């Protein structure tokens, strides 16, 4: 079974994980829109430079599908946010050719991509939510009623990599930094956890891995420690059953005492996946069963707890052609 990881960026470790799996006997291809992406130059069988998906989605999909047919790719794994909605819309085109694209349906992707839509989904399904406001006016009204006060936390509705997010300590600063594409939230202090929730082809959770996140870098997990936590496990099972995503979901949960808040959803393998994999949860190894609609046994503790994973700075040098 051949796999293509699209827009791999710096996530060459995904190739290494696949190649190290004794049960995997196919080829691994990688692509990116940047020929200097480090993930192109590693253990992959072949790499390809394609156009940026957002520049012209139709041309990108045509070229990607043509490449997959030529190389007999069985599974496409996207790993960056901007590409996910584009592939979700084109998922059936690939399926007609026998190619599984590892993305959820468009509705799930839209919920995950927009903080406002995510919050609406959480409220409608009875999940606990951090106090959130879409406008300065609604925030001021709540503040006047002593429901919330500074400091607050602002973030982009469609933000990625924590761009624009941060703590705001005064109304003057809020008016300066806030724009219509943002939300304002209570600045809840608690422990942050990253959770990998893997659903099978029937859209039911079969694997869950919980990690404490002591360090982040540019919105991505830099250090993580695997843990067992029943309260987070039950919340994650409920989320997986309710959201009904397909395959991997990278979820961030903030825990304050007995309260637990879902603060971010990414319908893909996230930056914290290496911590899950290196602790024994080989979610990549489940993809062949997912592709063939085969049953996957439920195991919510298919990993070792207390495993600390840290990202290091690796170096590569390759010969390039220049004008």
Q: What name fits each language-model region?
A:
Residues 163-244, 254-255, 259-261:
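Phosphate-binding site of ATP-dependent enzymes
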Residues 71, 228-323:
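ATP-dependent carboxylate activation and anion-phosphoryl transfer catalytic cores
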Residues 1-102:
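ATP-binding N-terminal substructure of ATP-dependent carboxylate-amine bond-forming enzymes
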